[in-house]
Amino acid sequence: MTSARTPRRKTVAGASAQQVGLNFETPDDIVCGVDEAGRGPLAGPVVAAAVIFDPAKPMIRGLDDSKVLTAKKRDELYDKIVDRALAYCIASASVEEIDSLNILHATMLAMKRAVEGLSVVPTLVKIDGNRCPTLSVRSEAVIGGDALVKSISAASILAKVTRDRMLLELHQAHPVYGFNAHAGYGTPQHLAALREHGPCEHHRRSFAPVREAHLRLGTGVPLPAGNVIVVSEVMLDDDAFGERSGAA
């Protein structure tokens, strides 16, 4: 990057997310914030984003955990983040990677891809949660970081908006599941559609409700080997299906 105004948007395949804020550990640190969206859904990829802000520029107002924002507000902030970030990258891990690695390792992969895809190399990466992927730079896990560290908040917004848009595209191809309404989460509507139609190729067959529907109806798509993820209520609400502030 030759200047802060150089295009710095990058979207890559794969998974692992990290975020870092502006409370630099040292004056010379380049801090990156990372977060993910889509651990709990029964369908679609897990998406991660990494964001670096320029500490010399005013901070964007209204940044917060994506779960407390309406869809309209997230879209507005998304545009501001990609316009004003010093660097950012959005990455994902596919359904196939989730099923082969498990959702935790796929999430770490998406985060790692997001950090490594940045056009500016950070010296410190702050990641929402209690785990960090293996990186070549310093990293720090921040529990509740999406509400505490502005660059993590920004990453949570980029990841959430990007994934929601992906699921809208999947809805166009597979309208019977209602991906436009629940973004792949295990709502009663989605579970009923799974029971009636069985899973499509975008469903995570390592997740118990999908596996059960597959075994009940059969879809011609092989089941993955390994452990089955039992979806809990916590997973169903892990990263913003239904904003805390109400439906957007």
UniProtKB/Swiss-Prot annotation:
Its main location: cytoplasm. The keyword Nucleus does not apply. A divalent metal cation binds at D35, E36, D128. Keywords: Cytoplasm, Endonuclease, Hydrolase, Manganese, Metal-binding, Nuclease. It is found in: Cytoplasm. PROSITE patterns: RNASE_H_2 (PS51975). Its EC number is 3.1.26.4. One of its GO terms (molecular function) is manganese ion binding. Residues 29-219 form the RNase H type-2 domain. Manganese or magnesium. Binds 1 divalent metal ion per monomer in the absence of substrate. May bind a second metal ion after substrate binding. InterPro entries: RNase_HII, RNase_HII/HIII, RNase_HII/HIII_dom, RNaseH-like_sf, RNaseH_sf. GO terms for biological process: DNA replication, removal of RNA primer; mismatch repair. It catalyses: Endonucleolytic cleavage to 5'-phosphomonoester. It is an enzyme of class 3 (hydrolase). Its cofactor is Mn(2+); Mg(2+). Endonuclease that specifically degrades the RNA of RNA-DNA hybrids. NCBIfam families: PRK00015.1-3, PRK00015.1-4. Belongs to the RNase HII family. This is Ribonuclease HII. It comes from Paraburkholderia xenovorans (strain LB400). The lineage of its organism: Bacteria, Pseudomonadati, Pseudomonadota, Betaproteobacteria, Burkholderiales.
